[in-house]
């Protein structure tokens, strides 16, 4: 008997008035590009319903809330952990994960007054199971179509780690990827459906750069990240991370958000296949020409 494909739309409703929560932690450059594009579009299929940050000092979140007349929710992660007797806000320990769950539950209560059909994680740092409540689109500074020998995504990790890994593998280019986040407990970091990637952002390799990267990678062996994060490899990665943001993130993320709101994407959870207008399209490429 032929297996039946279980293809499902990501969105629960098909409406011309979708509402999105915009989550951010830092400078908010991705959020800025997405919100500006949306505001300029007279036929926009979604609207921002709330801006969310875990940092009381996030000026970008305050600015966007005022600029676009959108409510702002600030849920202080550091203060919450301190109130529960913890100085560090990580999820590496059982106690840390328990507090993160409490923090997320409190965030859910804070978001109840606002309509949310999906969320845009535009540089939102905390890992949170709020991603189980509605689809959460996230930009990632790595090409998630690149797999290791076991068929697993290779360029995963936070901040500049995917760029560093691409450099250590001597890859010819970088890409930004947009995924629908899943719980970090179920798929690990950077799991979830891959909706789109940016066009390649070339790495300008020279013999000297190859040697510098290889030497720095060798010197890292046996050391903790805090001991080497500002080494030559880290500095090169930081430069390329900025190039990737401009030529990758800012190109692919706004377009994927609009295509997502338009209902173009669907997903077969059994096979992990993403569909675009009914055709398999995992890792669909977006270029500046289509902006």
Task: Please name every model-derived segment.
Residues 1-291:
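One-carbon transfer enzymes
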């Amino acid at each position: 008997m032929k297996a039946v494909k279980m293809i499902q739309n990501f969105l629960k409703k098909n409406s011309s008035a979708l509402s999105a929560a915009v989550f951010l932690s830092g400078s908010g450059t991705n959020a800025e590009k997405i919100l500006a594009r949306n505001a300029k579009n007279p036929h926009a299929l979604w609207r921002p319903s709330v801006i969310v940050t875990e940092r009381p000092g996030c000026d970008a979140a305050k600015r966007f809330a005022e600029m676009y007349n959108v409510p702002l929710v600030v849920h202080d992660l550091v203060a919450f952990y301190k109130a529960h007797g913890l100085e560090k806000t990580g999820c590496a320990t059982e106690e840390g994960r328990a507090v993160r769950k409490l923090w997320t539950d409190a965030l859910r209560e804070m978001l109840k007054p606002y309509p949310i059909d999906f969320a845009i994680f535009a540089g939102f740092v905390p890992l949170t199971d709020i991603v189980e409540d509605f689809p959460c689109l996230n930009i990632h500074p790595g090409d998630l179509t690149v797999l290791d020998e076991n068929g697993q995504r290779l360029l995963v990790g936070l901040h500049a780690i995917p760029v560093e890994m691409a450099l250590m593998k001597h890859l010819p280019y970088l890409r930004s990827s947009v995924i629908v986040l899943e719980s970090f407990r179920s798929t690990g970091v950077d799991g979830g459906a891959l909706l789109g990637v940016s066009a390649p952002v070339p790495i300008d390799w020279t013999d000297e750069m190859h040697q510098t990267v290889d030497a720095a990678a060798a010197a890292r062996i046996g050391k903790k990240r805090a001991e080497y994060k500002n080494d030559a490899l880290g500095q090169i990665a930081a430069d390329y991370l900025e190039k990737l943001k401009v030529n990758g993130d800012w190109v692919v993320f706004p377009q994927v958000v609009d295509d997502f709101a338009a209902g173009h994407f669907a997903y077969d959870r059994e096979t992990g296949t993403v569909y675009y207008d009914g055709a398999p399209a995992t890792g669909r490429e977006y270029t500046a020409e289509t902006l």
